[in-house]
Regions:
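Auxiliary Fe-S-binding modules of radical SAM enzymes
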Residues: 1-92, 244-253, 258-346
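Short linear Ser/Thr-Pro motifs
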Residues: 74-75, 108-109, 122, 192, ...
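Generic beta-strand structural signal
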Residues: 80, 92, 103-107, 115, ...
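P-loop NTP-binding catalytic core
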Residues: 88-102
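Canonical Radical SAM [4Fe-4S] cluster-binding loop centered on the CxxxCxxC motif
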Residues: 98-135
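Conserved alpha-helical substructure of the radical SAM core
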Residues: 124-153
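Conserved AdoMet/S-adenosylmethionine-binding subsite of the radical SAM
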Residues: 144-320
Length: 346
């Protein structure tokens, strides 16, 4: 028996082609796309303007991504963290963060991660599989329906390396930004990468108006290779060349993520090396005190030293901010909730 496919993953163009093969008129595709990506239905029977015969055929061949909220944690500031169970039983994490300008969702792009960053809970059990475009969309739709408010911004900074799931992430971006769907503008989307250089170049060629956020976390190869195995394949100087190419090709600024680890990458010397590395790029640095991760030797830099590091960067001409810690009482490290579920602690 043929496996059902996720209709939520199809772009409008792909959906049009599928329906044409079924002998359906072109306008049906836009109607179906509206039902899935604008009205956010999760059952074909809810599509009241569609012929019953067509709905029966769709039901046989497709499913609509609709994860189950396995666990929900809400902080006093309104931050909500979800453990979502996908159709195949695998779990991922999604977070809603509330700001003065709107609601931001942090989405996962893979079940697990194979990048091996040593301060991250998401990667400790490796990668199980990639998420499909429609599954990533469904994280946003599930969160939006749960909080009853529009999601206006997206950060691809949850479980997984987005550029390691390039094709599905590109389809997700096309669907989520479509005027026929929830229409979240590319300028309201940030995509984070640990530094897969060939994929950064491939992304540059798309000339999307999103913000690229580079998970740098160290200013030199000695420290970065100790924290992030990806640096062995794409060392700092190679990564920075790719980032500059990206800027030249797209005309978009980039930001750098820098997780502060006590005694590892938080010295004045590191601040100077970091400033030397990115000065003149017009880039922004987000300083992030790491969350503790079971089994990791790393601990977070204390607040006073994070502030000192920030001031050092700014004195050297680099714009840096300390990331606001939303939902501190539920701010378990990214991937920790999923890991606890896998270990039977949830």
């Amino acid at each position: 028996m043929e496996m059902k496919r996720c209709i939520s993953s199809l772009t409008l163009e792909q959906l049009t082609a599928e329906l044409k093969e079924m002998g359906q008129p072109g306008f049906r595709a836009k109607q179906l796309f509206h039902w899935v990506h604008q009205k956010l239905v999760t059952d074909f029977s809810a599509m009241t303007d569609q012929p019953k015969a067509l709905l029966a055929r769709l039901e046989e061949a497709f499913y609509i991504a609709a994860p189950i909220i396995e666990r929900r944690q809400e902080a006093k500031d309104g931050t909500v963290k979800y453990l979502l169970r996908m159709a195949d039983g695998n779990c991922i994490e999604t977070v809603v963060m509330r700001y003065h300008y709107g609601n931001t969702v942090c989405v996962s792009t893979q079940v697990g991660c194979r990048m091996g960053c040593r301060f991250c809970a998401s990667t400790q059990a490796g990668r199980v599989r990639n998420l499909e475009a429609g599954e990533i969309c469904s994280e946003i739709y599930t969160a939006q329906k749960d909080i009853g408010e529009r999601i206006s911004h997206i950060v691809l900074m949850g479980i997984g390396e987005p550029l390691d799931n390039f094709d599905e992430v590109m389809r997700f971006l096309e669907n989520i930004s479509s005027p026929e769907g929830v229409n979240i503008g590319m300028r309201n989307i940030s995509l984070s990468t640990c530094g897969l250089v060939p994929k950064i170049d491939q992304l540059a060629g798309k000339k999307l108006q999103l913000t690229l956020s580079v998970s740098l976390h160290a200013p030199n190869n000695d420290i970065r290779s100790g924290m992030m195995p990806v640096n062995d394949a794409y060392p700092v100087e190679v990564l920075m060349q790719a980032v500059r190419r990206y800027q030249e090709t797209t005309g978009r600024r980039v930001s750098f993520e820098y997780s502060m680890v006590r005694g590892v990458n938080d010295s004045d010397a590191c601040a100077k090396q970091l400033a030397d590395l990115i000065r003149g790029m017009g880039a922004h640095v987000n300083l992030i005190p790491i969350n503790p991760v079971d089994g990791s030797p790393y601990s977070a830099t204390d607040a006073a030293n994070v502030r000192r590091f920030q001031q050092k960067l700014e004195s050297l001409g680099v714009n840096a901010t300390v990331r606001r810690r939303l939902g501190s009482e539920i701010s378990a490290a990214c991937g920790q909730l999923r890991r606890d579920e896998m270990n039977g602690k949830v």
